[in-house]
Design a protein with these regions (language model features):
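Alpha-helical transmembrane-bundle signature of multi-pass membrane transport and export proteins
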Residues: 2-423
């Protein structure tokens, strides 16, 4: 039996009370909620800064979107190796301060009349690099903060908060942008990172000392060790494959749906916004139902059973059209994102539960590299299929991918796992 399987075989310890009543997790939860809310605001504000204040064209706006995520592909794997050598919370605090400075420079330069598109790109890229380190360190810090027996509960709270801030943050952002100029709205995100850093400072440096990584091993060797660890582990490999397939398929849909709904079907843009808002609701509901469903059906079993049950609903998305088919497609999108919410809780908890402390950074970085890479491939594939075969063909390809995401889990030891720590 592997180390991962031995970890999963251990019975979960009872959780006496909600994690939200415990100060350390409450501080982390508050930091995450505030910074995610700020990020949701700036996701609207930054493109508007480019368009309204700097008169950017479509290619420049696309470049900004690319710069916000490309850091995971460029430095994600080295960041994981570096985080494994370092205490996690100081890394998170430093990343928050860097993000606050980078984004805070945008309204400052605008107020002085010195803001340029190059400055905006640099701020987005620097913030993206800091986000890589923050996310990897945050995922790696959670087992230390709450204990491995309460990971599912902790992740359920965090994923729910993420979904709520995605829904509410864009609403707040829209109202804020109606009241102030877009560059000033970016200041909200910068302030949210300062708030997050202040909360993390109150947590202290952490009780677990920095792992004593073999300093004779270079970063390249440590990256290779992380890749091999994920690929050879019977729990992590199917999670990576299923997650990559899910992300690729979701991104295929999200890329072409705006073209199909607004251009080919001629529906107003608010319909598209409402359609995607349904997806945010699905993630929220899935994250809240993850623990009870895992208890009812088994933590491993719920992953592949939900994937199998959701498969037909991906076909409804591909059938989107005017009238009743629009409602059917919205139902398909709701159910599909409901599964994503469950996955975000259960899969992340599995990942954290089976990985030794000294490998957490590299494991999380490898997973983020795979998942972000799948998003990039999905975007490129959507463009290729949409150009050659039409946007409807891209939706059918996404439906096929969504119909297959349960296979890696069903063919792995996860299919027999009933209890995950904290469920």
């Amino acid at each position: 039996m592997t180390t991962a399987q031995q970890t999963l075989a251990q019975p979960p310890a009872p959780a006496p009370r909600s994690l939200l009543t415990e100060r350390p997790f409450r501080l982390l939860y508050t930091a995450a909620a505030v910074s995610k809310l700020g990020t949701a605001v700036s996701s609207l504000a930054i493109p508007l800064v480019a368009v309204v204040a700097l008169h950017a064209d479509a290619a420049q706006v696309g470049l900004l979107a690319t710069l916000s995520t490309v850091a995971f592909l460029l430095i994600g794997l080295p960041a994981g190796a570096w985080v494994d050598r370092s205490p996690k919370r100081p890394v998170m605090i430093a990343a928050d301060l860097v993000r606050a400075a980078a984004l805070g420079s945008v309204p400052a330069a605008w107020a002085l009349g010195r803001l340029t598109f190059a400055h905006l790109c640099a701020a987005v890229l620097v913030s993206g690099v800091a986000t890589v380190f923050f996310d990897v360190a945050s995922l790696s810090n959670l087992p230390e903060l709450v204990g491995r027996d309460r990971l599912t509960e902790a992740n359920a709270h965090l994923v729910t908060t993420d979904a709520l801030t995605q829904i509410g943050g864009r609403t707040v952002g829209g109202l804020l942008l109606a009241a102030v100029a877009a560059p000033a709205a970016v200041l909200v995100d910068a302030a949210s990172y300062l708030w997050s850093a202040a909360c993390l400072l109150r947590l202290g440096p952490g009780t677990t000392p920095a792992p004593r990584a073999d300093r004779r091993a270079g970063i390249r060797q440590e990256i290779g060790a992380g890749l091999r660890f994920v690929w050879r582990d019977p729990v992590l490999r199917p999670i990576a494959l299923a997650g990559g397939c899910t992300n690729l398929s979701i991104q295929l849909s999200q890329t072409v749906l705006p073209l199909l709904i607004t251009r080919e079907l001629g529906l107003p843009s608010w319909v598209l916004g409402l359609f995607f808002a349904v997806g945010g609701l699905g993630v929220l509901l899935g994250s809240r139902c993850a623990r009870p469903l895992a208890r009812r059906f088994g933590a491993g079993r719920v992953l592949w059973l939900m994937g199998l049950a959701v498969a037909p609903f991906g076909l409804l998305i591909a059938l989107v059209d005017r009238g009743g088919w629009l409602w059917a497609a919205a139902l398909g999108w709701l159910v599909t994102t409901f599964k994503v919410g469950i996955d975000n809780v259960v899969k992340v908890s599995f990942r954290q539960a089976v990985t030794p402390d000294h490998m957490l950074g590299r494991m999380n970085a490898t997973m983020r590299f795979v998942l972000t890479g799948a998003l990039c491939v999905g975007s490129a594939l959507a463009g290729l299929l949409g150009t050659v075969l039409g946007v409807r063909a891209a939706l059918w390809a996404a439906a096929v991918g969504l119909a297959l995401v349960w296979v890696p889990i069903a063919r792995s030891p996860l299919r027999r796992v009933r209890a995950l720590p904290g469920t």
